[in-house]
Amino acid sequence: LIAAECYCVTCLAFARDWTDRTSIIKGKHVTGHAREYDYKDGTGFAQMYGYDDQPMNTSANFGPPFYPLEYILRDAVGETGKFHGGVGHTLSTILDYPFLTGRSTQDSTLVGELMIKALEQGLTRFGW
């Protein structure tokens, strides 16, 4: 079982077969950030700390994401797979064994529950 949430789903799109270089999620159903839910600003806010472990008066804001994840995932799954954005729904979690994807961090609890069901009960499909 391979699970990824939020922008980490990108790793699945870029993991490739050595021979034909197709994505390992080709033909699979996945979810991730839809264009409607991409951050417009505020990606990468981080409190920075000095060598004395005290907060510094600075942080990092990279603005919007560096890439539109929806388009990357749509291309990676190909014509026989499907991207499910879950727009308008609080949660968007897809299990297409061996891949379990959650659109964002609010999917974490459900992703964890589905991990248990997949590993202990043999669940192979959920969310579409």
Regions found by a protein language model. Give the residues of each.
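Active-site-adjacent pocket-lining segments in enzyme domains
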Residues: 1-3, 7-128
